[in-house]
């Protein structure tokens, strides 16, 4: 009944009910996206009013699976520990889902690799990261300064899923060298970075990973990393936020907390 009233009020068809199926129309998708944004703003308003009464701030931060595995979680925990008035909730998701949640106000900030051209979204640079070949410390490559693509083709490779930014950056650099992932011996694809690192440590294969996710292992000397010849796979780690985000002082504090956390691994 409510949907029918809404359709009449907006003069659109939200659902196509033909052929015995109920399918969301293009106009319906716009209505749903707008409703999500309104709900996000409403929840944000309720949280802000509650926070102002209790003199605290709630911050929902979305991070990619890569960011979850590097010192960012530690930096957020440090910031929360040092600031009693700030309560942080961290959620993980794919980069596309995080941007969607950011635009519908379901999250306040997103920590992402790279940038997208969107006038509503602002960025603050946190760090510059680069992809490396990660191998077991017992692997013959561990003592090398560099490895070639031809040598890499002879290795068992464990890669992130095709939907990940890490995988896409590697694939793009291969293509610029007239190569393809299909030229390599990929034995396993998975999304969990901790599992990939565990398999590398146990010499099941090698992987292309962001250096930032290997800092703990490098400090413990449980994984070795090295560059791949002709592949300069550099990317930014950015703090993304809506143009109307008001607590800009928190942004710089979070970057400072991240830099402070990084220094512990050096």
Roles of regions detected by a PLM:
Residues 9-10, 31-53, 254, 258, ...:
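Alpha-helical linker/hinge and terminal dimerization helices associated
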Residues 56-119, 190:
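Central regulatory/effector-binding core of bacterial HTH transcription factors
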Residues 71, 204, 224-266:
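A late-sequence structural motif
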Residues 94-99, 103-107, 112-113, 175-223:
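Hydrophobic hinge/microswitch elements
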Residues 157-178, 247-248, 255, 265-266:
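Secondary-structure junction motif
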Residues 122-132, 214, 219-233:
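Short beta-strand->loop
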Residues 5-24:
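A short LG(V/I)-centered, amphipathic sequence patch enriched
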Residues 120-131, 135-158, 162:
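Flexible hinge/capping segments at coil-to-helix
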């Amino acid at each position: 009944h409510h949907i029918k009233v809404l359709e009449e009020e907006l003069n659109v068809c939200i659902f196509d009910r033909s052929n015995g199926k109920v399918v969301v129309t293009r106009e319906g998708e716009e209505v749903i996206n707008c409703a999500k944004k309104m709900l996000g703003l409403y929840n944000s308003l309720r949280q802000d009013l509650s926070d102002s009464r209790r003199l605290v701030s709630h911050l929902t931060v979305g991070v990619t699976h890569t960011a979850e595995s590097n010192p960012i979680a530690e930096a957020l925990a440090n910031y929360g520990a040092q600031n009693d008035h700030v309560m942080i909730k961290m959620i993980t998701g794919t980069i596309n889902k995080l941007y969607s949640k950011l635009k519908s106000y379901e999250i306040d900030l997103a920590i992402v690799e790279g940038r997208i051209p969107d006038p509503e979204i602002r960025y603050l640079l946190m760090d510059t990261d680069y992809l490396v070949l990660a191998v077991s410390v017992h692997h013959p490559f561990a003592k090398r300064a560099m490895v070639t693509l031809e040598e890499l083709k002879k290795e068992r490779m464990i890669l992130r899923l095709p939907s990940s930014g890490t995988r896409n950056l590697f694939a793009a650099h291969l293509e610029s060298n007239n190569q393809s992932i299909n030229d390599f011996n990929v034995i396993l694809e998975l999304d969990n970075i901790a599992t990939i690192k565990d398999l590398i440590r146990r010499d099941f294969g090698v992987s292309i990973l962001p250096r930032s996710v290997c800092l703990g292992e490098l400090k413990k000397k449980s994984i070795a990393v090295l560059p791949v010849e002709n592949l300069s796979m550099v990317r930014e780690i950015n703090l993304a936020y809506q143009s109307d985000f008001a607590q800009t002082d928190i942004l710089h504090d979070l970057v400072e907390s991240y830099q402070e956390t990084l220094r512990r691994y050096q």
